[in-house]
Curated annotation (Swiss-Prot):
PANTHER family attached to this UniProt entry: NOL1_NOP2_SUN FAMILY PROTEIN _ ANTITERMINATION NUSB DOMAIN-CONTAINING PROTEIN, NOP2 YEAST -RELATED NOL1/NOP2/FMU SUN DOMAIN-CONTAINING
BP GO terms, sorted: regulation of DNA-templated transcription; rRNA base methylation
Chief place of localization: cytoplasm
List of residues binding S-adenosyl-L-methionine: C254, A255, A256, P257, G258, G259, K260, D277, D303, D322
UniProt feature coiled coil, ranges: none
Protein name (Swiss-Prot/TrEMBL): Ribosomal RNA small subunit methyltransferase B
Organism expressing this protein natively: Serratia proteamaculans (strain 568)
Function: Specifically methylates the cytosine at position 967 (m5C967) of 16S rRNA.
The reaction(s) this protein catalyses: cytidine(967) in 16S rRNA + S-adenosyl-L-methionine = 5-methylcytidine(967) in 16S rRNA + S-adenosyl-L-homocysteine + H(+)
NCBIfam families, per database record: PRK10901.1, PRK14902.1, rsmB
Positions of the catalytic residues: C375 (nucleophile)
Intracellular or extracellular location(s): Cytoplasm
Length: 429
């Protein structure tokens, strides 16, 4: 039975909501996915994520193929063209099906008069594909990053920037966190082997396992029973560094969606954990994750800049501050970040981070441990932030966690390893 919707037009609408309205794909996609069949959901995700991952290349090709861009009310048709080009370049969908479905997208978008234009541009691309790709390989569109971000990465990592860009442009590996309350990692790896799922342990992070090929969570042994959680390896490093202990008062600040909250409780099930986030909606995810794993934490809505409003004068033995950041370390998981962020955001985020760390420091007990973490790779949010904090606070001591000259440890995204992530471990004197 033929569907009564056109998937390519839905993808074009989603891309428009990201690029024109500044919404994230994780906000846009769930409601759109409710309108389509289960089997089409993965394809919609692939079309949206893939198109945004290689956006500059697609944009450049369209500029060569059209005398003037489609603007105003026709802008969604421009995104439809991008979706068409993405399929021709990066998917195994037969070209005739790509053309037929993408051209029909113009009808679904109530622009049937533009069917001929869409068809013509896609066919012209097929004829000129080899020549266009050769030319595209010699201009800046090949980096698939906005120029401001490319410049920042080049300045921060003069010897490594190309590897970082390359990692950002690839699909991410799927990492799991084995729940040590149920199984050792070795035991769970055996269960996966019996289920025919190929995986390997992380060399450093004790609960982390990488799947050699992604699979549905429903295929993972004991997922519904909380035996395992999907979480990137670098994100797991936060709790390894925090080293929570039973009986301690622990704060997970900026906790949503709860991956680190639950990891703390798996590591120290008798700890008293408070999970706080400013976003009431995202706190629902924290509660869902706690429920699936049958763990308990005190979950509160609150602003990290005003902790007295949600914890009074309470002090904690350990604090994990996973600060709001540019998310430049997780671009491969969320390619829309490249187009949602602006250069001016970085200074604003650094100011917000400084405000939060200042506000929460008095709530750490003397002798207590704070881990400051971000999923950014930009020094302004990471090593520079920690250096400035240490200069302001004689009562803070940095625990060395890396071999760099800068304070803290900076993980960079790697095709076979974790995302870009920064951690610094501070002890209150």
């Amino acid at each position: 039975m033929k569907n009564n919707y056109n998937l390519r037009s839905i993808a074009a609408i989603a891309i428009g909501q990201v690029l024109d309205q500044g919404q994230s794909l994780s906000t846009v996609l769930p409601s759109l996915q409710k309108t389509i069949s289960d089997k089409d959901r993965a394809l919609l995700q692939e079309l949206c994520f893939g198109t945004l991952r290689v956006l500059p290349q697609l944009e450049w090709c369209i500029q060569q193929l059209m005398a003037k861009p489609m603007t105003g009310k026709q802008r969604t048709l421009h995104y439809l063209l991008m979706v068409g080009l993405y399929q021709l370049l990066y998917t195994r969908i037969p070209a005739h099906a790509v053309l037929a479905e993408t051209v029909e997208g113009a009808v679904a978008l109530k622009r049937p008069q533009l069917k001929g234009l869409i068809n013509g541009v896609l066919r012209q691309f097929q004829r000129q594909q080899e020549e266009l790709l050769q030319r595209a390989a010699n201009n800046d569109s090949r980096y698939l990053h906005p120029s401001w971000l490319l410049k920042r990465i080049q300045q921060a990592y003069p010897a490594q920037w190309e590897q970082i860009i390359d990692a950002n442009n690839q699909k991410p590996p799927m990492w799991l966190r084995v729940n040590r309350l149920h199984h050792t990692r070795e035991d769970y790896l055996q269960l996966m082997e019996q289920a025919g799922i190929a995986a390997e342990p992380h060399a450093e992070y004790r609960d982390a396992v990488r799947l050699l090929a992604p699979c549905a969570v429903t295929d993972l042994p004991g997922f519904a029973d909380g035996w395992v959680t999907v979480q990137d390896a670098s994100a797991q490093g936060c709790v390894d560094l925090l080293d929570p202990q039973d009986g301690e008062q622990i704060l997970d600040l900026c906790a949503a969606p709860g991956g680190k909250t639950t990891h703390i409780l798996e590591a120290a099930p008798k700890a008293h954990v408070m999970a706080v986030d400013i976003d009431e909606q995202r706190l629902k995810r924290v509660k869902e994750n706690l429920q699936r794993l049958r763990l308990h934490a005190e979950v509160k809505q609150g602003d990290g800049r005003t902790p007295q409003q949600w914890c009074g004068d309470k002090q904690f033995d350990r604090i994990l501050l996973d600060a709001p950041c540019s998310a430049t370390g997780v671009i491969r998981r969320h390619p829309d970040i490249k187009w949602l962020r602006r250069d001016s955001d970085i200074a604003e985020l650094a100011a917000l981070q400084a405000e939060i760390i200042e506000a929460i420091w008095p709530h750490l007990k003397s002798g207590g441990v704070m881990v400051y973490a971000t999923c950014s790779i930009l020094p302004a949010e990471n090593a520079e932030q920690v250096s400035a904090f240490l200069q302001r606070h004689a009562d803070a001591r940095l625990v060395e966690t890396g071999n760099q000259q800068q304070p803290g440890r900076q993980n960079l995204p790697h095709p076979e390893d974790g995302d870009g992530f920064f951690y610094a471990k501070l002890i209150k004197m």
